[in-house]
Amino acid sequence: DVLMEADRRGMYARDVLSSRASAKAIDQRDSAFAARLALGVAATQGILDELLDQFLDKPKKVAPRVRMALRISTFEMLYLHTPGRVAVSQGVELVRSGAKSAAGLANAVLHKVADNVEDFATASDVDESERRLVRLSRLMGLPRWLCARILASFDTPEGALNFAGNLAPAPLALHENAFATKPDPYISQLVAPVFPGCHAPVDAQVTVASGVFERAAAVASDLNAQLIATAATRPGRCLEIGAGRGTKTYVMMCQAKRAGYERQHTALDLHDRKCDQNLARLHKAGIKGVRTVSGDACELNEVLTSFDAMLGEPALFDTVFIDAPCSGTGTMRRHPEIPWRLTENDVTCELPKLQLTMLKEAAARV
């Protein structure tokens, strides 16, 4: 259900998991395994389909729910090394629970997957000239074109194997609220921060269960993202472009508080909904002094019309921080669907053009 909802609504599986209250009511081990399956299938969906489609007579006519069930069992065999007989049996029952008439198809296809999974994993089914790239693509669960670019970016072929960790759970880091009026009971138990406000890594399940995020005592943010936001925190007026739901807004405001900076912060995002979410979390955390504005950062003059009118001249800022739309490949472990929603044209053409336009617009406001 999590995977179907994520696929149908264009969401990330991790976000769907977080929103499911029922997931918190089941045993922790069951919950962790369910999350492992959901995120793993999301991360490797293209590879799983490549294997499955070899044994489906009419791949495009397979019902979405049936395909998703087949993906789950195939993921278990290919990446979790679940014995074939176990994965096949579970997969057939899963298909039967949602589409009884497709149980026979599932049984036949999954038995063929079990018989061929080892050859597929080692890429012995492809020409030797392509075997290395295909094997790495299947190992990493990534599109072939992306694997080729990763290989080209390393000095040695062995270096690319680091990306095999793409399928491992991403470490969780959090940033502590500097505006809190009293110590948070959970954060007080943690070891000293890596740098001011940043605790990493922390146990994901324990941290989420503590309620620290619900009470806005901290935000979840990758360590490197916190470093970037911290480096961009300066006194004076700041325009944050691409603020989203405000994770970096939160971090920058907290770091400014710790540094004793006097500043005014304007957070801009394309979507009204995200601006509202940003302000709601800041309010809950007791963080004041942030204004939000929604609009297209490629048309800053239009977006900042009210600011300019207030000043009687174009508004200028001491710092402009741009979190521009990007490939997202730096967060693949956290949002594993990204590689399969991305095209090579996005990386080489569309995204760079958008980023340059945003940069030019922002440069006129410094």
Question: For each of these PLM feature ranges, what is it?
Answer:
Residues 1-366:
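S-adenosylmethionine
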